[in-house]
């Protein structure tokens, strides 16, 4: 147990069926559900086969319709979770589209997990997409998509390194060009980093970025939202269906400087977008849900440009 109240420890590890890795699989499962139907909310045809390849029974049953998406015994239903991930995914998709429309041809996805943007987005010719994550995660996704016959839609370069290690050197060694403008995303990552590691991550991004580079992430002002008893109550309901995960034990608590404030202090122009505005931009209304109200106050979306 860390001094900040998290069950996480420095240097801990996981796979895609446990701990932090299971949250990445849950995101992919939500993307898979949102990609179904005649008028899908998303277009991520790779999410479902990736989740099935992970093989966690809860997420397989979720895809098979054996777990109710909308039930009153959850403080935040899986249906609301699916909508949240839909909005978040589309925000980061559009961030990359805007960056490449502005001429940026180098993209970095930090903690890529089961993210399939290098395969499913329409990248301009000459775009290089770097995916950074733990070696086991990178290998699993690469091998699974290869078995499906999937081909990247950009030049995909994998950087198999833990973000707590010297990932900037590993990124450069894979051909990253720090003199070129870059579009960076850190989607759903920051809560799982200790406060000092979040600052170090942002400082490394700044050091690697040429003027005109762009970054998108979440801006978190209050980590207590992750330890609310209503959020913890989800664990007992999930456990009944076979998923023993408590997000409150996976995040790092304690005081941290909001990413937007840190970036502004290091030369970035920052735009903060309230959660309800981003929901509205994609045709959704933020549910009148106690947990989501707390998240709305504590977390916003952030885009930034250097210089």
Swiss-Prot record:
Pfam families: LCM. Its EC number is 2.1.1.-. The keyword Methyltransferase applies. S-adenosyl-L-methionine binds at residues 133, 162-163. It is an enzyme of class 2 (transferase). Keywords: Methyltransferase, S-adenosyl-L-methionine, Transferase. The keyword Transferase applies. GO terms for biological process: methylation. GO terms for molecular function: methyltransferase activity. Exhibits S-adenosyl-L-methionine-dependent methyltransferase activity. Belongs to the UPF0677 family. NCBIfam families: mthyl_TIGR00027. This is Putative S-adenosyl-L-methionine-dependent methyltransferase MAV_2732. It comes from Mycobacterium avium (strain 104).
